[in-house]
């Protein structure tokens, strides 16, 4: 079954709302125009209605990512929309996409911590503009507030904080169709990209695996050479083996600590729906590091890896550093051992982890050697 990204469902709710606002009856489906002359799609609508004596309208959809394992499945999306006269003085809150279109992040929608601006991809921006442009009204701006009622709760299960996004889910997505990072098709396309990169005449035997779009964004911000980067999904194990088969000599895994800690526990498919051993792994290595039992018990009650890390850093920063250093070394060891199960190889695999504050914090021994050659250093508080 075909699934669509979050921006598509937001645009569908907005389009349903604006149509009832101008007096049309709501329909059970809306046609969404895509970018770059792609064929339009039909998206189901849950409901739409006018509010405040016809001054506003509300459109509601439920996100459906198709067969993809995604925490946005069933997410209820509200878009509240109204026309405001251009001469009218209004709040400066929100993002002006066009002189006639302003978007306001409501409850449960992610905002950048430093600027308070909505976290929205360029694809989502353009999709809103294309689909709402026919409803421009001379002398008025179209204001829409996006609300995800369960957005704050779901955001706690993501790495949004690692990229400076707070208060809810980011409105990201670079295309209409869901890219299934956990699917076999995605794995095969990534292996193909890896082999193509290794076949290039400029290939030097060194690669960097970055985990997801967010990992890629941060790696590029740090100035890491894009010609060495392969963006991966959740199938890390087979990709490590494929790298060894292509005679990669040095491989760096660059990712969020909440993802990579799974490798320290021997889990090489990192999607949270299929395996989530993070707190158990942290506790196991805390025992090996002889961390006091009272602290370990606090880990057990932590709601996330980040919360457990904060507990330890607040109590004993030096012990926290030792624990995460040990985890990074274990990730390297487990990764090399995984490869050797399937392939005879002398590949060196390094692991470097960043935290929710977008700081590179921890690295194993192989990783330290590699990042030093890039001119990067671990950051500390």
Curated annotation (Swiss-Prot):
It catalyses: Co-precorrin-5B + S-adenosyl-L-methionine = Co-precorrin-6A + S-adenosyl-L-homocysteine. It comes from the Bacteria. Pathway: Cofactor biosynthesis; adenosylcobalamin biosynthesis; cob(II)yrinate a,c-diamide from sirohydrochlorin (anaerobic route): step 6/10. Its EC number is 2.1.1.195. InterPro entries: CbiD, CbiD_sf. Keywords: Cobalamin biosynthesis, Methyltransferase, S-adenosyl-L-methionine, Transferase. One of its GO terms (molecular function) is cobalt-precorrin-5B C1-methyltransferase activity. One of its GO terms (biological process) is methylation. NCBIfam families: cbiD. Belongs to the CbiD family. PANTHER family: COBALT-PRECORRIN-5B C(1)-METHYLTRANSFERASE (PTHR35863:SF1). This is Cobalt-precorrin-5B C(1)-methyltransferase. The gene is cbiD.
């Amino acid at each position: 079954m075909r699934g669509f990204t979050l921006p598509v469902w937001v645009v569908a709710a907005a389009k349903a709302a604006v149509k009832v606002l101008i007096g049309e009856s709501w329909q059970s489906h809306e046609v969404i125009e895509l970018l770059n002359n792609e064929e339009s799609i039909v998206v189901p609508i849950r409901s739409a209605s006018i509010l405040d004596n016809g001054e506003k309208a509300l459109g509601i959809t439920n996100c459906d990512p198709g067969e993809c394992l995604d925490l946005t499945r069933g997410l209820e999306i509200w878009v509240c929309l109204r026309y405001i006269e251009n001469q009218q003085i209004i709040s400066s809150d929100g993002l002006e996409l066009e002189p006639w279109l302003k978007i306001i992040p409501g409850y449960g929608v992610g905002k950048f911590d430093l600027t308070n601006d909505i976290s929205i991809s360029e694809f989502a921006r353009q999709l809103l503009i294309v689909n709402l442009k026919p409803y421009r009204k001379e002398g008025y701006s179209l204001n829409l507030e996006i609300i995800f009622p369960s957005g704050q709760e779901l955001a706690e299960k993501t790495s949004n904080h690692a990229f400076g996004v707070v208060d809810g889910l980011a409105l990201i997505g670079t295309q209409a169709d869901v890219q299934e990072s956990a699917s076999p098709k995605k794995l095969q396309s990534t292996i193909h990209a890896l082999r193509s990169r290794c076949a290039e005449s400029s290939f030097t035997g060194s690669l960097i695996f970055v985990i997801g779009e967010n990992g890629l964004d941060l790696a590029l911000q740090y100035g890491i050479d894009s010609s060495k980067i392969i963006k991966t999904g959740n199938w890390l194990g087979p990709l490590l083996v494929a790298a060894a088969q292509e005679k990669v000599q040095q491989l760096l895994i660059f990712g969020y600590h909440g993802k990579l800690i799974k490798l320290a526990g021997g889990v090489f498919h990192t999607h949270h729906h299929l395996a989530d051993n993070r707190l158990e792994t942290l506790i196991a290595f805390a025992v090996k590091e002889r961390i006091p039992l009272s602290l370990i018990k606090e880990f057990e009650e932590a709601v996330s890896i980040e919360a457990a890390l904060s507990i330890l850093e607040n109590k004993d920063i030096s012990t926290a550093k030792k624990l995460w250093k040990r985890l990074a070394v274990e990730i390297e060891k487990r990764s090399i051992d995984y490869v050797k199960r399937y392939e005879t190889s002398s590949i060196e695999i390094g692991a470097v982890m960043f935290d929710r504050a977008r700081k590179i914090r921890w690295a194993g021994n192989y990783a330290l050697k590699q990042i030093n050659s890039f001119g990067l250093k671990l950051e500390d508080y």
